[in-house]
């Protein structure tokens, strides 16, 4: 049995050991001793009448300050032989004084009170312990009308003052007299053990929570220590507790005896005395533990801050406030005033008007009044039970500890413990529709031409090309998926999303908002066999714009496979050869991707300069259209004949699908330029009108549009400044809508094509066009001269420099349509041309396309749909009835509105507060959610003041300024002299040295090969993807001849490709990758000197390029480099490498192209060969390159086309890349 609050009950005595210390109150209870209730009949208390009680003996008492007037409660009956008056213990209040002599052995009790689980006031209660020293329950007598007169017996301040001890007998507390008590003396209870007679602080302050041994009265900090102590017999006599129970004779007669018994072992830290060495050693463990709260004026430390504060009062002697009526001292004047009100003048001055009960404080009276008014302001949130006191509510709420999830959300079924948490959850849950099977768009809208969307029909629509559902397997996802986890499409997108999942005004007009062209004009404008109709979606203008500036080079293709051309067509041969993707007027890329410039300033600046360049499109096509009009009509005869057979929507789907396939073909030509064309097969089987790539998705990608939706009359010439201050998106929209010009001429024209004798030959300057080559699109930024006119190279600048052009030779044309520039929205990681983890290049791709529902919500195709939808909104101003037409179509592109609900498995229990309304991801803090939302919205609020780059995260902006502009690299590697901007990057770099990955040796493991190959591949992929970005995002350069345009693209622009790649991917790369790219940028500047070798982390560079004038030699070199790479032992890995054998040496061709730019000599060219490269490193580069290229192709792939499959070089490249990526995915898992 022990008292829970002994430390707070302790008060120092002004007579013994505490004379030198100011009295420190440990707790003041306003109503501790002064609550009066008349519910119990009171006994009349007489004055002391014992014969032994003389006036002399009471003189000091009467003359002491304790005789100050205090309130004597009469609610508890006091026996006649005792009286209740001021205690001699400072701060204790009232005490029990005897009127007669009490001898040793008398018992008083039991201690009365309420049985509770815990003590409300530890000064008026006891804890009842079981045999294992566990608290069974508590006896609480803190209420004024509860308990017996025993609760007024106070604890002694010193050991020699006590005359009573307490013991527990049968779950009851009794007091036993252990010393003779003379009349007029106060009954004082045993408090401290005999080893603490002179310690200024109570034992509980040092030991926090004591556990007493009933045999020797030794205190322990934990029950485990007490149990260990009780395993051995105690060396000290039995304590007073055991004496009461066993009726033993009290033999502790003097303090000197205790000194002899307990003075053997002293603690050097706290001066405590222990009976034996074992107890002292256990006690010393408490000093070895680190205590969090240490006193700054003495070496003492405490585990609780309250104990430290209480201890520091002993040092702050000048900050005490003494009571004038008693010896009590306070550290705060408010505590002193509260003490005076409750114990002295004006005590319990607040009386209840209803029952007359008085209270020391107004708050106590206010709380008491709730009883009379039946007001219960404290309500349980779980069961809505109400209480008048908050403590009662807290006690009640513990009952709900085992059933905290009692309230269920009616919408999603999630359980909550309180109504407040449920209400917070409903903000995100109510009004949502959970994912369910069914069409994504308007209900009842079926795909034109197909009664049902089953797997068989999808395969048939794709013309035997395996769709993505077949590609990823049939047992992983339901049948009819256009991409993983997506049900079928309806209305060109059946079953992609549940209807009503997003809310947005309909965007697709049911009928053309503008008048169409005549059939003759359409026939003239349909230049590509893949384009059955002239209209091209406005969302596809970015790639088209870049196509005009950077035609991908295809000169390294074997010419012997090209059809024969007539002599009249030779002036166009060079142009056609250089741009395999130039039959494309418009390619759709989702804004926000890294295939285009993602920063807001780049978007706006490009937009301003595009208008000047693109308005000249029609002129260049008019100059070339006459020889091609007949052929265009013939090649599209089948499609035009189908107009009378199929519905308009089917024709429109065919047209749009062809446009997208052309887009893919354009990107493929760039990839083929960098990845090389060696190993491609079936080029001689190419046919006119063939699909450039197998359909990656079995259904048409874009929605259907009517045939006459996009008329594009000629534009007039108007000059705009090349570089202006960036404008806000709203200003850009105003500028676009206010202009009468269209940013792009979407008219397409096809050149006449005739067969050419097969055989190796160099490309000549005579114009001719192969039937397999896409048409050359000449946008306003590129002049289409008939010869090989040379112009000055493009300057190294992100925005380019305006060049002179033969603008006087171009007929002007009018524009009636203006399309809104796309704003970044979905920044899907598949578009972010980031450096994938070198350990598994295909991991990000697998994660993107194999993730569970609802990952398809942000598939790259959906990003393209969103961009297209945004651009379609710009048509609302073209025609008065356009807005009505837009509203007549079901909502298809409601991507901006939050989903109605998310699947229950996505809703986390609790913390539903910060949930992404687009993808359902949950974040612990609002700042994390804000940063995450920028990945959906494309917002980049942090703009660099030096280069107008924008970032979505402020830390990326700071790193950009520090590393790019300030060139701060204070951390230098002592092994290779490489510098880093951060210490962590240097440490990561040094680990590569330690692991041997920086040596470039062939003895490293495949994992280390991947790491060491990353730096080599960085330059290649940066060059490749930078050109694609320029292909998409830049239209600020003057016209160039075709040959010099290629030199510009791979020449001077090659110097800033690393910086541009860094700026485009700064938000996506980690710190080391940013540092690496900055270093690569500096290295590229050194490469401007022709013939200067390039260093790349101590590894031999692999990039080789083929001079344009030595095509035959380059082709022979590439053929000689086709030695089979060393295979890994894994069988599945062999298939992955063999599938990509045709792009093994894309790095070699890249270096050859660079040497062409720098005009390497033949000797230098022959000295560079891929034979110097370890085969294992080649395989690493092949795996990474194929995954990067495959991701690029996959993001722009069409789902279906109505044309037969072709075997063009681009088609073969894409088909094999896809198969290799599939096998490599399996290999990557097994490899890891």
Swiss-Prot record:
Modifications made to the protein after synthesis: May be acetylated by CREBBP and KAT2B.
Residue numbers spanned by region Interaction with SUV39H1 and probably MAPK9 and SMAD3: 191-442
SMART domains assigned: SET (SM00317), ZnF_C2H2 (SM00355)
Keyword line: Acetylation, Apoptosis, Cytoplasm, Developmental protein, Differentiation, DNA-binding, Isopeptide bond, Metal-binding, Methyltransferase, Nucleus, Phosphoprotein, Repeat, Transcription, Transcription regulation, Transferase, Ubl conjugation, Zinc, Zinc-finger
Zinc finger (C2H2-type): 211-238, 265-287, 293-315, 321-344, 350-372, 378-400, 407-429, 914-936, 942-965, 971-993
Domain SET: 80-192
InterPro entries the UniProt entry points to: SET_dom, SET_dom_sf, Zinc_finger, Znf_C2H2_sf, Znf_C2H2_type
Residues spanned by motif CTBP-binding motif 2: 774-778
Keyword Transmembrane found: no
Pfam families linked: PRDM2_PR, zf-C2H2, zf-C2H2_6
GO MF, one annotated term: DNA binding
Catalytic activity line of the entry: L-lysyl(9)-[histone H3] + S-adenosyl-L-methionine = N(6)-methyl-L-lysyl(9)-[histone H3] + S-adenosyl-L-homocysteine + H(+)
Protein name: Histone-lysine N-methyltransferase MECOM
Organism encoding this protein: Mus musculus (Mouse)
